[in-house]
């Protein structure tokens, strides 16, 4: 019967499948995996990767470079791998706890590690991130829309499964930070394009342009339990997370170095609960105590607990390097380390000042996971930063944030073993410029990593042309006013660690305080939100708006996740209130919250900012540190600063106590050491010296060259002033003509004179005679010697009059006299007549005259009386030129014949002209 035949065929088919199943599990091929209800079955392929190295990883030694061949969808992929030698800092430690709660800290048991970065051979813009500790785990990005996950099969020594990354399921979740997520496309193209620009190995020369984060990872007790109480498995997962995060941030020119790892094997060391806010602040408080024992830049907690709501991570904004807030918490929501790594990278991004991506920022589609800084994450995981993140990071660094990121770990004891030619300076090496075929350093022998003959150094910003630069040479400039410059010591080729002024140090002329290397003001924050021209609103706006305790006016969220009302004392630490003429804030998904307050009949406008979130986020979820809040570290009053939504006294920074030991001649840096002003010597700035600190290196010694130059300049100016004073006093002596012979008077005349006519200072100015017309005799002089002169106190004596053609009056004098332009025209004359010898003895002091021709009188400083000399009178000459006339009555003295004035040497004329020209 047809029915029985159908049943028989079904049974035979089922039997065949049962017989075939073991073979399918042992041979390469596609199989199905369980999937969520309503989704198609997910497939993975069973493979056995093939190593092409002298020794296979996992047998005691992991090679520095390796070639791995895997099959994926019928295609062989050749992976070129290189060990991530910068993943672990030299000071890396591991800490666990005994049952009694005592910490047990150890260093690495082996110099070998098993974490790699690489590419797919012959595939442009590809990227590989793997670990080979126990089997092969990691991510293989082939092209823009094709990437694979590879992981070992449980209880198998060689088999692995490989599947497309979109088949990795992650629970949906979001960050507590208030923002909305974008959608776009081609995430892998952007990600691999960014990673391609980075060198395959990070060379010593590149360290100076890199930012370096010393990361401390902590797994709480719930995470330890989630890994079946296996301490080694928990540590391996955290190491994998760090390896992925390092790969993500390399595209931003940032390296992540794991400086410490801690597993809470016997209970939590801080309060960890389902509340992400209380967990965050409890962990940050615990971290402050850790800093005294273990130096690091940033700490992240990985918890096995599930946070309430949809929050999977939380972190403060713009807090990188902060003693109080540089850290975050992330929930372990995936069995695969890459899912958790995306969340950790997201929270570190908030510490870097990155907000959630707005629309059109991310070029990765939601179907491919979107971008790392999206507000919500889920299926699949994000892997790339957006271009908006780059801009926000640059802006954060330019404002002085991330000061600790230049403090790169000493690479002389890198975790991973020593090898000449790996590009890292290690113990026993004088230099390392990479392989011989790629070394371009003229100071280093690539074959044996030694310095060439005569070379003192080969690497570092304090090494120039193979020589150490002089002590005091600046090697790192001061970025902003809260930063401090660093100087070479003359003993090391490397620039000292980057230091900045201690938190709580006044800046902006006392209008703000330094915090985390930044000088934060309300004005600057308003301009960041609204653009140029924005300014903070009146204090009344802060008090009225933030007293509401709602979405639009609050002092952040409390430990229960609810908005807090601001007390009048804390009002200026809540939502920032600004005044701006702009229609809306600069943030693409932000809206303006406008409030109008009436005070004594005056309308006051207050403008706040609210970042719009999607409907799924608006319901109860959000971060207390949204962009519309006043930033931590902003001055809210005298000796008060905003901290955690409260206006607190700055005494907890201990700045005043530290500053006292600097004796008023320096400031404290973030290492609590004095940075002395020039002229004072560290460590306490109480003795003369060049300045600087024990941390930042010495300031350059004062050079004697500028001092000598200054002394000579002062002496020259003094000599000029004395000469001018002498000439001035001589020119104001009344009725004392010189008794020197005529030739000597030529030699001792003043080489130049400053005009008192208020002219333009030109070398040959037109003089403004301050004497009424008809009161002065004006004679002409050779053109090369016509210079300004001081007016004498009285008319010239008779012996200075000569019979010669009259000189024209200056144009402005002719205009004042009402004469015609022709009357003031210049009359060229080649030579003037010699003056008659004096009829009486001359005074002993020489008269200081500008010109060596004494036929022209000196104009007086003030107007002469109507009849300056009794018995004389004046009358106009033809052509409008006024000449002083002798008395009309009485006998006239005989006049000697006119004798030509000898022509002066040419060099004298040039010298006079040069001196006066220098006064223009």
UniProtKB/Swiss-Prot annotation:
Which residue ranges does UniProt annotate as crossing the membrane? 704-724
Bias class Pro residues marks the residues at: 835-846, 888-903
Q: Which residues bind Zn(2+)?
A: 133, 346, 350, 356
Q: What is the annotated signal peptide range for this record?
A: 1-26
Q: Which GO terms describe its cellular component?
A: collagen-containing extracellular matrix; Golgi apparatus; membrane; nucleus
Q: Which keywords accompany this UniProt record?
A: Cleavage on pair of basic residues, Disulfide bond, EGF-like domain, Glycoprotein, Hydrolase, Membrane, Metal-binding, Metalloprotease, Protease, SH3-binding, Signal, Transmembrane, Transmembrane helix, Zinc, Zymogen
| Annotated ranges, domain Peptidase M12B | 211-409
Active site (catalytic residues) = 347
Q: Which residues form the propeptide?
A: 27-204
Membrane topology summary: Single-pass type I membrane protein
The protein in question is named: Disintegrin and metalloproteinase domain-containing protein 19
Organism encoding this protein: Mus musculus (Mouse)
């Amino acid at each position: 019967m047809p029915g029985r035949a159908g049943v028989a065929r079904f049974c035979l088919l089922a039997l065949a499948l049962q017989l075939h199943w073991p073979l399918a599990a042992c041979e390469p091929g596609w199989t199905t995996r369980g999937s969520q209800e309503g989704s198609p079955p997910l497939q993975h392929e069973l493979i056995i990767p093939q190593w092409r190295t002298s020794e296979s990883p996992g047998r005691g030694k992991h090679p520095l470079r390796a070639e791995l061949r895997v099959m994926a969808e019928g295609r062989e992929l050749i992976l070129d791998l290189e060990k991530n030698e910068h993943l672990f800092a030299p000071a890396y430690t591991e800490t666990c706890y005994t049952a009694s709660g005592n910490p047990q800290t150890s260093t690495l048991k082996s110099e070998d590690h098993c974490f790699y970065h690489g590419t797919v051979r012959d595939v442009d813009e590809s990227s590989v991130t793997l670990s080979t500790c126990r089997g092969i785990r990691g991510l293989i990005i082939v092209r823009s829309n094709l990437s694979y996950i590879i992981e070992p099969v449980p209880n198998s020594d060689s088999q692995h499964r490989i599947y497309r990354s979109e088949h990795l399921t992650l629970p949906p979740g979001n960050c507590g930070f208030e923002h909305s997520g974008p959608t776009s496309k081609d995430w892998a193209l952007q990600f691999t394009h960014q990673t391609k620009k980075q060198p395959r190995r990070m060379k010593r020369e590149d360290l100076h342009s890199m930012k370096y984060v010393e990361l401390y990872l902590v797994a709480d007790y719930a995470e330890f339990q989630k890994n079946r109480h296996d301490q080694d498995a928990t540590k391996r997962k955290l190491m994998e997370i760090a390896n992925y995060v390092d790969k993500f941030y390399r595209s931003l020119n940032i390296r992540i170095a794991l400086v410490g790892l801690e597993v809470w094997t016997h209970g939590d060391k801080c309060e960890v609960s389902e509340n992400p806010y209380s967990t965050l602040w409890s962990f940050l408080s615990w971290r402050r105590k850790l800093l005294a024992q273990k130096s690091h830049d940033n700490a992240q907690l990985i918890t096995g607990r599930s946070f309430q709501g949809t929050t999977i991570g939380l972190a403060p904004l713009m807090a990188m390097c902060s003693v109080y807030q540089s850290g975050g918490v992330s929930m372990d929501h995936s069995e695969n380390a890459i899912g958790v790594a995306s969340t950790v990278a997201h929270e570190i991004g908030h510490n870097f000042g990155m907000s959630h991506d707005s629309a059109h920022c991310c070029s990765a589609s939601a179907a491919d996971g979107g971008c790392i800084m999206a507000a919500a994450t889920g299926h699949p995981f994000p892997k790339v930063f957006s271009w908006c993140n780059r801009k926000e990071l640059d802006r954060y660094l330019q404002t002085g944030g991330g000061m600790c990121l230049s403090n790169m770990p000493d690479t002389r004891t890198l975790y991973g073993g020593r090898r000449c030619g790996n590009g890292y300076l290690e113990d026993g090496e004088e230099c390392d410029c990479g392989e011989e075929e790629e070394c371009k350093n003229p100071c280093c022998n690539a074959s044996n990593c030694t310095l060439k003959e005569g070379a003192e150094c080969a690497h570092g910003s304090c090494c120039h042309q193979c020589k150490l630069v002089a002590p005091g040479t600046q090697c790192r400039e001061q970025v902003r006013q809260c930063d401090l410059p660093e100087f070479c010591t003359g003993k090391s080729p490397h620039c000292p660690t980057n230091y900045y002024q201690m938190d709580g140090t006044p800046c902006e002329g006392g209008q703000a305080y330094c915090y985390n290397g930044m000088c934060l003001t309300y004005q600057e924050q308003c301009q960041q939100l609204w653009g140029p021209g924005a300014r903070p609103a009146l204090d009344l706006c802060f008090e009225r708006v933030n007293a509401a305790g709602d979405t639009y006016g609050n002092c952040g969220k409390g430990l229960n996740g609810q908005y807090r009302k601001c007390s009048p004392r804390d009002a200026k630490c809540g939502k920032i209130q600004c005044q701006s003429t702009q229609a809306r804030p600069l943030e693409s998904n932000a809206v303006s919250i406008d409030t109008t307050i009436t005070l004594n009949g005056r309308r006051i406008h207050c403008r706040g900012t609210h970042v719009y979130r999607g409907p799924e986020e608006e319901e109860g979820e959000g971060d207390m540190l949204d962009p519309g809040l006043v930033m931590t570290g902003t001055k809210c009053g005298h000796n008060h600063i905003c901290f955690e939504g409260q206006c607190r006294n700055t005494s907890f920074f201990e700045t005043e106590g530290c500053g006292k030991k600097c004796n008023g001649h320096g400031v404290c840096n973030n290492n609590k050491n004095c940075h002395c002003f020039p002229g004072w010597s560290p460590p306490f700035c109480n003795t003369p010296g060049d300045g600087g600190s024990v941390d930042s290196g010495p300031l350059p010694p004062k050079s004697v060259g500028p001092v000598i130059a200054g002394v000579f300049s002062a002496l020259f100016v003094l000599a000029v002033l004395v000469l001018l004073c002498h000439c001035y006093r001589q020119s104001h002596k009344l009725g004392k003509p010189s008794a020197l012979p005529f030739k000597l008077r030529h030699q001792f005349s003043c080489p130049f004179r400053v005009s008192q006519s208020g002219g333009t200072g030109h070398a040959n100015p037109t003089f403004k005679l301050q004497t009424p017309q008809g009161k002065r005799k004006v004679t002409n002089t050779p053109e090369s010697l016509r210079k300004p002169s001081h007016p004498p106190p009285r008319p010239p004596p008779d012996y200075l009059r000569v019979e010669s053609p009259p000189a024209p009056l200056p144009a402005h004098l002719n205009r004042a006299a009402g004469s015609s332009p022709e009357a003031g025209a210049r009359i060229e004359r080649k030579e003037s007549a010699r003056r008659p010898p004096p009829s009486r003895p001359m005074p002993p002091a020489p008269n200081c005259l500008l010109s060596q021709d004494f036929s022209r009188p000196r104009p007086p400083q003030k107007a002469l009386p109507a009849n300056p000399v009794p018995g004389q009178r004046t009358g106009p000459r033809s052509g409008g030129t006024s000449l002083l006339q002798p008395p009309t009555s009485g006998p006239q003295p005989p006049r000697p014949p006119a004798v030509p004035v000898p022509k002066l040497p040419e060099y004298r004329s040039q010298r006079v002209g040069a001196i006066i020209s220098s006064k223009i």
